Amino acid sequence: MYSRDLSKNIPIIQNYANQVQGLLNRYSDLASGKIELNFIEPEPYSDDEDYVNRYGVQGFPIDQEGSKVYFGLIASNTTDDIETVPFFDPSKAGTLEKQLTDIVYKLNRSKKPMIGFLSWVDTTPPMMPNNQLGQGEYTILEELSYFYDFEFLDTDVESFEGIDLLIVYHPSDISDKTEYAVEQFILNGGKSVIFVDPFFEKNDHSNKSSNLENVLKTLNINYNSNVILDGAQATRLQTQQNITDNTSLQTMLKLNWPEVRGQFINQAEEIGDGLSLIRLVSPGGLSPLNDESEISYTPIMSSSEVTMDLPMKEVHDPIKLINNFQPTGISYDFGVRLSGIAKSNFNDFEFKNDNHLEISSKNINVVVFSDADFIRNAFWARIQKFLDTNVIEATSDNGSLVTNVFDSMTGYDEFIDLRNKEAPFRPFVVVQ
């Protein structure tokens, strides 16, 4: 729906409307009759205006008389599922194709993949009116819930029936039985994403460090559980300093907060393709445990060689870190993808299952990150209000990285490039 006459004197809206309409027409042409378009121009106090308001499309006031421009979308499928764009924001033109493709994909997908979320931190999104995003600390999970079903699991779970993708988040106090269940799920072909962290910096969380020692050995991962300092990728923070009653801004290096960029993000791996900045918070270090393993180890993002590792208790004073920084020349990985044949590290476990697997039944598919903080809003998202709707402004690619992982692991990888590259004009390929 679009108020064409009222927007004639608003070039930015008019131009973007032409772009949106052109893209919708292109989608319809490619769909061979499976997408039907109806363009509505709501008049004040009309049935059309009541209809669009009922589904959340909002008018944008343009004068003191209360005239409103409508510029939104209501999409539905044959089972009456509804997706709505309250108002097309011209400042988001670079991601229009991704926005529309997400809607088409969601309405066309018969069943959402089930995400099993095994977390030692409260990541459950709050229940908000009108599905408002951005009220919790893990907005990325709120976003992903539009495309995936989530089951938040108890930390003492011992089986993962019906789970398409298992997330293990900051396992700070995992039992042997649960860790064994995670390993056997992976060896049996289950897909998993693991977040471990040497120093989880959330103030109200008592268990600061996490590990998954036995599973990581199964995955042929050597995990340095010290905090990795990176002198070449340190975050630069602006701080205020008072000197004789004059306040000045000073730049301070936060060595334990790497900003991973450029050559340190693997563009050849589809999860990292197109990403330009990942902000990490006191990460650990990953490397292969045994070079003779049958597991394929692919870095997603890495440190420089200007690094030093320190125990968690020694990284609280940023000035002290700078003064005592002595690079070792060792490079670490912060995120890796693993595939191939894995062998159990629980063959002598007292509580083995009757159908215990000593070797994986097929190639494993696992992603491991050595930081858990980076998916929290504070390190990638700024929440703003637009027409009474919370809008997420990304300040780094952390959210895209997490979404890429989910999409790649569950078969939605055809659309990863739409998220990572702001290119409104590109050749179209029909995805079967």
Located regions from the model:
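Generic structural motif
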Residues: 4, 42, 78-80, 90, ...
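Juxtamembrane amphipathic/hinge helix adjacent to a transmembrane helix
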Residues: 403-431
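Generic, ordered loop/turn and secondary-structure boundary motif
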Residues: 86, 119, 224, 301, ...
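Alpha-helix boundary/capping detector
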Residues: 50, 63, 241-243, 428-431
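Acidic, S/T/G-rich, low-cysteine, solvent-exposed domains in lumenal/extracellular/periplasmic regions
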Residues: 109, 126-414
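Short linear loop/turn motifs
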Residues: 65-70, 226-236, 421-423
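A short, polar/proline- and glycine-enriched secondary-structure boundary/capping micro-motif
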Residues: 94-97, 311, 379-380, 428-429
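Juxtamembrane extramembrane loops of integral membrane proteins
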Residues: 1-106, 110-179, 183, 391
